[in-house]
Amino acid sequence: MAQKLEAIGRGLQWDDSSDHDNVTKILVRGGREGIQYVKFDYVKSGQPQTGLIHGLSGRGGFTQTFEIDQKDEHLVSVEGYYDVTKGVIQALKFKTNKKTSEMIGYDDTGIKLSLEVKGKKIIGFHGYAETNLNSLGAYFTTTGPIGLNPQVGHIKLAYQGGGGGIPWDHGPNHNGVKRVSFIFDENEIRQWRVDYDDGGVIRQYEPINGYDMFEVKEYPTEYIISVECTYDDVIPRSGRRMIRSIMFKTSKGRVSPIFGYPAARKFVLENNGGALIGFHGRVGAGIDALGAYFSSFIPSPPPPSPEKLQPEGGEAVGDPWDDGIFNGVREIHLEDGEGIALKFVYDKDVQVTELKVHGEPSGIGFNEFKLDYPSEYITTVEGFWDKTSGNERGVITRLRFTTNKQTFRPVGLESTTSFSLGKEGYKIVGFHGNSSTDKLHQLGVYVVPITRE
């Protein structure tokens, strides 16, 4: 099933749907007021699909196209800028696994938008439009359990075992193997069934109900990387060699039971951690020989788990609060009066989230610090806290934020005790703390390792 990144906006809703194989051509029409319309062409089951215009044509401006070679190229992300006042997308930029378009449009200011899911490709668009393009969302699907199209990047390992029976081949055009079922006796693997993931649809080969089954529990983040087989003569010195046992290993270190009865001769099918995406071999009364298709690329490691750093400041008085974990921080809003009040604007899967104020605003007005998200992120927060009259258990009096690109000016007053939040090699993706009705007492952060994009 395709993953849908939502688009919310004014105008009329449109939806190209998620049942395409790939995006092949993009047409963008723009003018001074923003993007006037977009049109996307697709391929579905090998056949070209011409898309509809979303927006209004027939006005002055410019038209640009961006073409994608469906043979070995796919769309991975879209970036752009959105004018909140006009409610119109101002510019768009498209990126495939091979190339990136220029920023299409006149205005590269406003809120930056990004449509991207790591390890997935875009197969459809939806959004809102009227006289202009008001918003844009996308449908994503896996390009294989390792983030590539298995039809493009795979290797075929020759079958091994006996020479009897007839050849068979399931092919490499699958995302991965979900489960395998077996019927076997003391002499051979007699029958089996392989359940492949074909773009979210489970396709079965050899429709039997096996006595024993191996299932990849956490597919698609877990996948088979190794198949170990043994084979030998079914009858001693008969020369009729058959596969006698099979065992699997996964990307998360799990090892299956041995299916069948091990024999003396052994071989292993694997490709340096690549994902198993298909089988072939020879078959007669049982499985005579077995070979496999593996992805020719190594998967990227899964995203790191966030780490919660304990809050700093005074005592844990008032009410605890927790903004949660996000992809990153877009804006910081700080106000200083008798203490610090703050709020953050976050990004979570392209959705902008502005959370409530922590601490009581004094009415002076917030200082706003905007990050160049997603390329800019917070690395450290430095601050001071103190015990004051009426706040003997401590309040935060000053904060200063540092990113990978700059250090923002501090807000508030220095006091007796300083603190620092952050971790070397990590970025901040969320905040938590303690505050009462009018004071911020403690501040803590969530961090994740900085990875190369």
UniProtKB/Swiss-Prot annotation:
<protein>
    <recommendedName>
        <fullName>Jacalin-related lectin 40</fullName>
    </recommendedName>
</protein>
<keyword id="KW-0007">Acetylation</keyword>
<comment type="similarity">
    <text>Belongs to the jacalin lectin family.</text>
</comment>
<dbReference type="InterPro" id="IPR036404">
    <property type="entry name" value="Jacalin-like_lectin_dom_sf"/>
</dbReference>
<feature type="domain" description="Jacalin-type lectin 2">
    <location>
        <begin position="154"/>
        <end position="296"/>
    </location>
</feature>
<feature type="modified residue" description="N-acetylalanine">
    <location>
        <position position="2"/>
    </location>
</feature>
<feature type="domain" description="Jacalin-type lectin 1">
    <location>
        <begin position="1"/>
        <end position="142"/>
    </location>
</feature>
<keyword id="KW-0677">Repeat</keyword>
<dbReference type="InterPro" id="IPR033734">
    <property type="entry name" value="Jacalin-like_lectin_dom_plant"/>
</dbReference>
<keyword id="KW-0430">Lectin</keyword>
<feature type="domain" description="Jacalin-type lectin 3">
    <location>
        <begin position="306"/>
        <end position="449"/>
    </location>
</feature>
<dbReference type="GO" id="GO:0009737">
    <property type="term" value="P:response to abscisic acid"/>
</dbReference>
<dbReference type="Pfam" id="PF01419">
    <property type="entry name" value="Jacalin"/>
</dbReference>
<dbReference type="InterPro" id="IPR001229">
    <property type="entry name" value="Jacalin-like_lectin_dom"/>
</dbReference>
<dbReference type="GO" id="GO:0030246">
    <property type="term" value="F:carbohydrate binding"/>
</dbReference>
